[in-house]
């Protein structure tokens, strides 16, 4: 009898409740290349041993339930069950453990992030035996990755479409995010693109409200885009937010964007949902549209260090589901993002292969084989003084987005865009000449401002602006050792 059809019916059924660890804690297990591996930060309730807690996570996120059931005998649990195969205490934390769980690939539907998350981060997060639970990382096997399309186009194809190489791309979120009429919104888009930006962007909550319906916005933004392209000779884009209340409406908006001939649309992938996002990504590849992804709602899931899901997992899920850009924090701006951890998931988005690296919070070696990379987007509270640090931290394959840092310029939108473009070009040139952006950044910006009155005005406005709050999401360190 094959392992796939072997059952335990002949063993006999014994009703009752037994410890999870008797079945689901298997420290001797050797993981397979086809297993999905998960690293959970587990905080058990007092009196619950870590082995029982880890086994409970493995059980409740795979084949287990709270009591023995006679139908267990109708299948092969050894083939299908999740296994907690290793447990490490968290340095510097009492009663916290990293529990490693292996899931057989047959537990998951091909090409479905929705199904993968329903299993791995489903009911188990409300389990009473656990005080808190956080999914820190996943290892997605190549066999499963190949069932996904992934990003519609990827980094190289985007650069070829835009004909822009050797520098980060520049963007701007139109502000105020809500309340503008479609015509005034389009005017702001035109001024920013004419001033030197590559992209402008709908904010995440701009959908189709009474003050600005989506079709009107799309039309005025397309007009602005084409006018700016004609004046500058550069290819321009505006992230038209196709997020909607239904998948059908979302696709209708993407179809209209394609008919207008614009290069890129946008989706809020967490609030919109992974099923909708994957559908839109497939449409974008088939129709030549780039796809910008906003991560609205991510901090509800990933902000707390002991419960929820780390953003590196959400980033991996996005690369599977599909997106050409995704917001990834700034390190230096107003939003949460510690440098080493941020660079860890930035590499997961862009690179074909990443190694285990405890210093950057990466728990598993990950190969993406032929899956295209995703451009990380730095956005939130950044301005011209941040440009050297952003260029040094994120490198060329990134999008740097200045919303208030463009539209807040004292001379207007177009001068704000000019200031950012001059600052970026100065930083890229200085880097290419071998200068140290981390040490000489302020000097480089001051030198460039002598030749650009727009940049000089921006430097003066934002010279005192800082966001100096400690990051919540930091690496684990032994507090006793300091």
Curated annotation (Swiss-Prot):
Coiled-coil regions listed: none
Keyword Disulfide bond in annotation: yes
UniProt-listed SUPFAM superfamilies: RuBisCo, C-terminal domain, RuBisCO, large subunit, small (N-terminal) domain
Binding site for Mg(2+): 201, 203-204
UniProt record, GO biological process: photorespiration; reductive pentose-phosphate cycle
Cofactors demanded by this protein: Mg(2+)
Active site (catalytic residues): 175, 294
Prosequence residues removed at maturation: 1-2
GO cellular component term of the entry, any: chloroplast
Pfam families per the UniProt record, alphabetical: RuBisCO_large, RuBisCO_large_N
Superkingdom field: Eukaryota
Positions marked as site (Transition state stabilizer): 334
Signal peptide coordinates: none
Molecular-function GO terms, alphabetical: magnesium ion binding; monooxygenase activity; ribulose-bisphosphate carboxylase activity
Post-translational modification comment from the UniProt entry: The disulfide bond which can form in the large chain dimeric partners within the hexadecamer appears to be associated with oxidative stress and protein turnover.
Modified residues (N-acetylproline): 3
Catalytic activity: 2 (2R)-3-phosphoglycerate + 2 H(+) = D-ribulose 1,5-bisphosphate + CO2 + H2O; D-ribulose 1,5-bisphosphate + O2 = 2-phosphoglycolate + (2R)-3-phosphoglycerate + 2 H(+)
Keywords: Acetylation, Calvin cycle, Carbon dioxide fixation, Chloroplast, Disulfide bond, Lyase, Magnesium, Metal-binding, Methylation, Monooxygenase, Oxidoreductase, Photorespiration, Photosynthesis, Plastid
Subcellular location: Plastid, Chloroplast
UniProt key word Lyase: yes
Subunit annotation: Heterohexadecamer of 8 large chains and 8 small chains; disulfide-linked. The disulfide link is formed within the large subunit homodimers.
Further facts: The basic functional RuBisCO is composed of a large chain homodimer in a 'head-to-tail' conformation. In form I RuBisCO this homodimer is arranged in a barrel-like tetramer with the small subunits forming a tetrameric 'cap' on each end of the 'barrel'.
Function description: RuBisCO catalyzes two reactions: the carboxylation of D-ribulose 1,5-bisphosphate, the primary event in carbon dioxide fixation, as well as the oxidative fragmentation of the pentose substrate in the photorespiration process. Both reactions occur simultaneously and in competition at the same active site.
Family: Belongs to the RuBisCO large chain family. Type I subfamily.
Name the UniProt record assigns to this protein: Ribulose bisphosphate carboxylase large chain
């Amino acid at each position: 009898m094959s392992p796939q059809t072997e059952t335990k019916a002949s063993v006999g059924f014994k009703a009752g409740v037994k410890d999870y660890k008797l079945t689901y804690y298997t420290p001797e297990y050797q993981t397979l290349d086809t297993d999905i591996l998960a690293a959970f930060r587990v905080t058990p309730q007092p009196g619950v041993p870590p082995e029982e807690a880890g086994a409970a996570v493995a059980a409740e996120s795979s084949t287990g339930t709270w009591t023995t059931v006679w139908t267990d005998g109708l299948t092969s649990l050894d083939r299908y069950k999740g296994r907690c195969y290793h447990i490490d205490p968290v340095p510097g934390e009492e009663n916290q453990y990293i529990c490693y769980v292996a899931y057989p690939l047959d537990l998951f539907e091909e090409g479905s992030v929705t199904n993968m998350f329903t299993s791995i981060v489903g009911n188990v997060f409300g389990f009473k035996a656990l005080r808190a639970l956080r999914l820190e990382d996943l290892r997605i096997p190549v066999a499963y990755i190949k069932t996904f399309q992934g990003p519609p186009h990827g980094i190289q194809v985007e650069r070829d479409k835009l004909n822009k190489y050797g520098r980060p791309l520049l963007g701007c979120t139109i502000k105020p995010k809500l309340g503008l009429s479609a015509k005034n919104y389009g005017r702001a888009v035109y001024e920013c693109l004419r001033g030197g930006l590559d992209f402008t962007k709908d904010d995440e909550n701009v959908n189709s409200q009474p003050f600005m319906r989506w079709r009107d916005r799309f039309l005025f933004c397309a007009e602005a885009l084409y006018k700016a392209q004609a004046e500058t000779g550069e290819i321009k884009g505006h992230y038209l937010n196709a997020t909607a209340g239904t998948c059908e409406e979302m696709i209708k908006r993407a179809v209209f964007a394609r008919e207008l001939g614009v290069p890129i649309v946008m989706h809020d992938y967490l609030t919109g949902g992974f099923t909708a996002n994957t559908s839109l990504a497939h449409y974008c590849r088939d129709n030549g549209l780039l796809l910008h992804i906003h991560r609205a709602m991510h901090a509800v899931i990933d902000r707390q260090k002991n419960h929820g899901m780390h953003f590196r997992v959400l980033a991996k899920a996005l690369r599977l589901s599909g997106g050409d850009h995704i917001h990834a924090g700034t390190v230096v701006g107003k939003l949460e993002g510690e440098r080493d951890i941020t660079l860890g998931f930035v590499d997961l988005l862009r690179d074909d292969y990443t190694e285990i690296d405890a210093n950057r919070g990466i728990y598993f070696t990950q190969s993406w084989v032929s899956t295209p990379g995703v451009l990380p987007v730095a956005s939130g509270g950044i301005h011209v003084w941040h440009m050297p640090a952003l260029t040094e931290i994120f490198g060329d394959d990134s999008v740097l987005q200045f919303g208030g840092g463009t539209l807040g310029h004292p001379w207007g939108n177009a001068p704000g865009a000019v200031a950012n473009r001059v600052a970026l070009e100065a930083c890229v040139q200085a880097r290419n000449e071998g200068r140290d952006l981390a040490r000489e950044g302020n000097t480089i910006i001051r030198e460039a401002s002598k030749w650009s009155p727009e940049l000089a005005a921006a430097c003066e406005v934002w010279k005192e602006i800082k966001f100096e709050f400690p990051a919540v999401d930091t690496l684990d360190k032994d507090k006793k050792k300091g």
